[in-house]
Amino acid sequence: ALNIAARSGVDVRLMIPCMPDHMFVYSATLSWAGTLLEAGGKVYTYEKGFLHAKSVMADGKVACVGTANMDIRSFELNFEVNAMIYDEDIAIELEDNFMRDIYDSKEYTLSMYKNRSLIQRVKEQVSRLLSPLL
């Protein structure tokens, strides 16, 4: 869904931690981040600590915050939950927090993605193949 939105001109920004908690999962994350970059989205690596938040903000009107990774595994197998917030003030505050966090992040560019090492590419592809199990 994020790739489709980015390809249609929606401003899609993804923030991931710069330090992995699990290397295998992080490799899969970088692979999927590359797909978003190719679709026209932007990816940032948060440098000021470990970022584990899962939040989505849309149009300054709606926000989704919680523990789920926004995938079927999180919702069906792990029984994680998110809160849908239909409050403009809260959605705008969350967007403002995200924009402040960008200042503590580095942009991960399409050029960086395309110029990664062969070893990194292999790790990402193997991790991506197994990502439904992660």
Language-model features and meaning:
Residues 1-134:
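PLD/PLD-like phosphodiesterase catalytic module centered on the HKD motif
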